[in-house]
Amino acid sequence: GPSGCDNTCGSTLENDECDICGGDGSDCSDVTLPIPIALGWNWFSINIEGDRSINNILSSLNATVDDFIKSQSSSAIYYGEEGWQGALTELSVTGMYMLKSANPDNLVISGSPVDPLVAPIALSEGWNWIGYTPQNDGPINDALASITATANDFIKSPTGASIYYGEESGWQGALSTLTPGEGYMLKVAIASDLIYPNFGPDDALVRIQEQNELPSSI
């Protein structure tokens, strides 16, 4: 009788477009990360594998001469036809970048999704400019569960911040969800590795519903 890709008689398994026997096509499928760029300073990160050279990553921008990008340790300037030049030559998935743009724009990056479990972010004592590697939103307490947090550790985005209040209270503040494409500043007292979980599409929603259904204290 007929056999599938697993060479079992009667099997109907077929290779998906990634050549995975019985796969669902998710292992090789490209994803696209659109990042809206505002006039002035923008904090962003990338969660996509591939050519990380600065001129490739930023190729979708309609950049203007003297537009500026910096990481925590280096920077580059846009020179027009010569492209982006400076000590910052490659963008990492683990870092946050600040981009100063003379015009509103859209940064669009495509490629294969990063696996957060194999992209640890080494946190140093003090301030760290961190990226966000998962493909979906993550509730802050789940997202930062891997680090050695201590009271008064602090995380901020351009629009909100949260403080760590200890094991029972966790992270609390206006910054309650971490989001793909966004970057953050994280201040920690103890160096450790930040390894984000692989969040599903609904993980942040489920967590919000759980919080809403908690009985109120009497």
Residue ranges and their predicted role:
Residues 30-218:
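N-terminal exported-region signature
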Residues 1-30:
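Extracellular calcium-associated, cysteine-rich motifs in secreted modular proteins
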